[in-house]
Amino acid sequence: MTKPTIAGNRTGRKLGQRVKKKKLKASSREWLHRHINDPYVQRAQLEGYRARAAFKLLEIDEKHQILKGARRIIDLGAAPGSWSQIAAKVTGSTEDDIRVAAIDFLEMAHLPGVTILQLDFLDPDAPQRLVDAVGGEPDLVMSDMAAPTTGHHRTDHLRTMHLCEVAAHFAIEVLAEGGHFLAKTFQGGTERDLLNLLKQNFRQVVHVKPGASRAESVEMFLLAKGFKGRNVEHGTISA
């Protein structure tokens, strides 16, 4: 994959600089210091990506080859847009030939070659609008959706797993045969019914934790490769 033109450090801050914010709480100051000095954050700034999450997708793809040959891609929970940046590049999506659709309830700045829907994915109209935006069956459905955290691990896990399940049902209903599904999960166990559903409909199902995911994070990704097609029994989308 060709790397985008180096954009430079747009923050005006020297890389590796300390954070001096007297009014911030200690925990917030610690997080901000870690974020600014994170090598993946620095690389994202230098290579023109909107977020460090770009390297999670690139690392997963380096091992599992899910982007190669993709003609249409749908990005769920897309803001601020680093995965969509990569998707537009690999599909050759342009303003005249849109092949990438991104959705998030958060506002997301324009990206060339990407149709952006500022909408909750659980909205009943969202699935059809996404498929219409890319003009047919996608080869990859990827989801970085996560529910807002409450601080209660079990609650956070269940809420994010629900989003993962809805995304999985969507992928099964819209993917082209041979397509792939990638979704964020949290450590704490993937529901058996979801794993069974994916194993029934895909040729390979694995959990992956890319190096770009912070070591202390409970974040993981569920990858289902090689969609078997819709002649297989499967569930339907439920909000």
Swiss-Prot record:
Q: What EC designation does it have?
A: 2.1.1.166
Q: Which Pfam families match?
A: FtsJ (PF01728)
Q: Which reaction does it catalyse?
A: uridine(2552) in 23S rRNA + S-adenosyl-L-methionine = 2'-O-methyluridine(2552) in 23S rRNA + S-adenosyl-L-homocysteine + H(+)
Q: Where in the cell is it found?
A: Cytoplasm
Keywords linked to the UniProt accession = Cytoplasm, Methyltransferase, rRNA processing, S-adenosyl-L-methionine, Transferase
Its biological purpose? Specifically methylates the uridine in position 2552 of 23S rRNA at the 2'-O position of the ribose in the fully assembled 50S ribosomal subunit.
Q: Which PANTHER family does the entry mention? A: RIBOSOMAL RNA METHYLTRANSFERASE, RRNA METHYLTRANSFERASE 2, MITOCHONDRIAL
**What family does the Swiss-Prot or TrEMBL record give for this protein?**
Belongs to the class I-like SAM-binding methyltransferase superfamily. RNA methyltransferase RlmE family.
Which protein are we looking at? Ribosomal RNA large subunit methyltransferase E
